[in-house]
A protein has these predicted regions:
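Nucleotide/pyrophosphate-binding catalytic subdomain
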Residues: 1-189
């Protein structure tokens, strides 16, 4: 069995300060994932950025509430994001597949087993799964706190030996890093 790694990339890593997708950074990420695959790793990418990409794509004609914004911008942005990933990975002849999931898919049962089987079939056939929460239909109270949580669940589900979180946060903290009493945890085992 190949070594398995989950890479999570956050919106702040994927976007420039003006809110547009950072194609240069995404290209560098794709280069590194292609290298990992050449070293006999199975890679699963958990990618944020759909809402940001959608927000950049469309200015709405009326004020939207937070749920409407998330639904509209994620629907638009997911297509844009996957299109860019498709173009970048195609340069390495790497096929990608989209996996949109919800928190309920991680409860024991058929949905959990089906989701795991889907990603195993993709990996067995050389397809790189790109995972994100299905923000267009997820219910606010039942959503992941963020894709850090989602990537941890994916890593556990897929029995990954490594989880890499690419973020603009300086590490793992005891509390929200914006809290002045939060302390950096120097090592997680």
């Amino acid at each position: 069995m190949k070594r398995r790694i989950v890479v999570k990339v956050g919106s702040n890593v994927l976007t420039r300060t003006d809110g547009k997708l950072d194609v240069t950074r995404m290209s560098a990420l794709v280069d590194q994932i292609a290298w990992l695959r050449s070293q006999d790793y199975d890679v699963i990418l958990v990618s944020s950025g759909a809402v940001s990409a959608g927000r950049d794509e469309l200015r709405t004609g009326r004020e939207l509430d937070s749920v409407e914004q998330r639904q509209l911008f994620s629907a638009l942005g997911q297509v844009k994001l996957m299109g860019l990933y498709y173009d970048l990975f195609r340069e390495y002849d790497i096929h990608i597949g989209q996996v949109l999931t919800m928190k309920k898919n991680f409860e024991p049962g058929d949905e959990y087993a089906n989701q795991r089987q889907c990603m195993n079939v993709m990996l067995d056939n050389g397809v790189l799964p790109i995972v994100n929460e299905n923000d267009t239909v997820s219910i606010t109270g039942l959503m992941f706190t963020d894709n850090d949580e989602l990537s941890g669940l994916i890593a556990q589900m897929m029995q990954a030996e490594t989880l890499v979180l690419l973020s603009n946060i300086d590490g793992v903290f005891t509390k929200n890093p914006n809290d002045p009493t939060a302390e950096l945890i120097p090592e997680v085992q």
